[in-house]
From Swiss-Prot:
GO terms for biological process: carbohydrate metabolic process; generation of precursor metabolites and energy; glucosamine catabolic process; N-acetylglucosamine catabolic process; N-acetylneuraminate catabolic process; UDP-N-acetylglucosamine biosynthetic process. The gene is GNPDA1. The active site is at residues 72, 141, 143, 148. This is Glucosamine-6-phosphate deaminase 1. It comes from Pongo abelii (Sumatran orangutan). Belongs to the glucosamine/galactosamine-6-phosphate isomerase family. GO terms for cellular component: cytoplasm.
Length: 289
């Protein structure tokens, strides 16, 4: 497990975006080998998405051969509703990059058979070869996706009733009116995310500090579902200083001492332009008479 500690939200967002960029470029995706990326919604990943869009517009990172799978979607909210996760992903990420719509996968909260929709989503992930990198965020109560406290740590994609804390937290997106907030959602399970070859969890802000403490310094507990990722062989937690306020000083000092090593994951920062230049140069035959 790695814990990346940056001073501010913007730095944490940029580090995460650089990491995703390097992972995609090093994977060298193509028509026969897509990079599969799990994605979250919410305010935490917005800074990361903005940097990824910037990389795309600069010609450093294409998404043509990337397939995405989103974590969750509300039940009963129209797809074109401004607060649906379809709308969120389109407005904040997908419409700004060159990803093909058929390569973006988001659960349908208006499906006739919701459990069948969840089962089909799991099959789509399998058909794509599994998730290479699943990016996630958490709530103040440590939930990841909509795996609320008490969720099974081996759960799969399913229908979930939202906890009151989550409904209250999401009311700000619905004019502050609780009656407008959906009470159910479709969500990937903890086990679904655990199946990914690598997991990166973004945790920023003092209001997430106790959840990070539970995730890092205490044992695995289904009341804090993010703690399950202690047992994943390749978990990267990316946080800002505010999120470390509940951690022990020696814990923070230990992981900060590893930053010189961990920063090598994003430095050098790879670019598709550089790889294409190297490829063209290596294909040139040396001059001969």
């Amino acid at each position: 497990m790695k814990l990346i500690i940056l001073e501010h939200y913007s730095q944490a967002s940029e580090w995460a975006a650089k990491y995703i960029r390097n992972r995609i470029i090093q994977f060298n995706p193509g028509p026969e080998k897509y990079f599969t990326l799990g994605l979250p919604t919410g305010s935490t990943p917005l800074g990361c998405y903005k940097k990824l869009i910037e990389y795309y517009k600069n010609g450093d990172l294409p998404f043509k051969y990337v397939k995405t799978f989103n974590m969750d979607e509300y039940v009963g909210l129209p797809r074109d509703h401004p607060e649906s996760y379809h709308s969120f992903m389109w407005n904040n990420f997908f419409k700004h990059i060159d990803i093909h719509p058929e390569n973006t996968h988001i659960l349908d909260g208006n499906a006739v058979d919701l459990q069948a929709e969840c089962d089909a989503f799991e099959e789509k992930i399998k058909a794509a070869g599994g998730i290479e990198l699943f990016v996630g965020g958490i709530g103040p109560d440590g939930h990841i996706a909509f795996n609320e406290p008490g969720s099974s740590l081996v759960s799969r994609t399913r229908v979930k009733t939202l906890a009151m804390d989550t409904i209250l937290a999401n009311a700000r997106f619905f004019d502050g009116e609780l009656t407008k907030v959906p009470t159910m959602a479709l969500t990937v399970g903890v086990g679904t995310v655990m199946d990914a070859r690598e997991v990166m969890i973004l945790i920023t802000g003092a209001h997430k500090a106790f959840a990070l403490y539970k995730a890092i310094e205490e044992g695995v507990n289904h009341m804090w579902t993010v703690s399950a990722f202690q047992q994943h062989p390749r978990t990267v937690f990316v946080c800002d200083e505010d999120a470390t306020l509940e951690l022990k000083v020696k814990t923070v000092k230990y992981f900060k001492g590893l930053m010189l090593v961990h920063n090598k994951l994003v430095d050098p920062l790879y670019s598709i332009k550089e790889k294409e230049t190297e490829k063209s140069q290596s294909s040139k035959k040396p001059y001969s008479d």
